[in-house]
Amino acid sequence: MSPKESIELQEFQSLLQDEAYEELINKKTYEAIKYRSNDGILPIIITLFIFSFVISRMIIFFISLFNKNTYCELPAVADAIINSIALVCIIVILYFSSRKLNVEIRRGEVEDYRANLERNQR
């Protein structure tokens, strides 16, 4: 490890132990979660719509399955295909709505935040 990398690592470790750094991380995380929750209603609505569609198709499938007067092999295959496509859509939507949350702190931002805290405490 070069001396420059060693000094940067020591600076980073000292920042991690700083109380202002923890407060800044909590603040940034809260803002990121708030921003994501504002955008998160559309995937929930689409997921509920697809889920209700799957449930209604399953109900129709079971009614036609237990009705002895109809030939239900073709509707059963169609229902299985439609339900599997809808379930894949639900899984994809849930995957994208639960993606990893990234919090970014730029160099010097901790010092600025610490200075603002000290100014506000006076």
UniProtKB/Swiss-Prot annotation:
GO terms for cellular component: membrane. It is found in: Membrane. It is a multi-pass membrane protein. It comes from the Eukaryota. It comes from Schizosaccharomyces pombe (strain 972 / ATCC 24843) (Fission yeast). Keywords: Membrane, Transmembrane, Transmembrane helix. Its main location: membrane. The chain crosses the membrane at residues 43-63, 76-96. This is Putative uncharacterized membrane protein C622.06c.
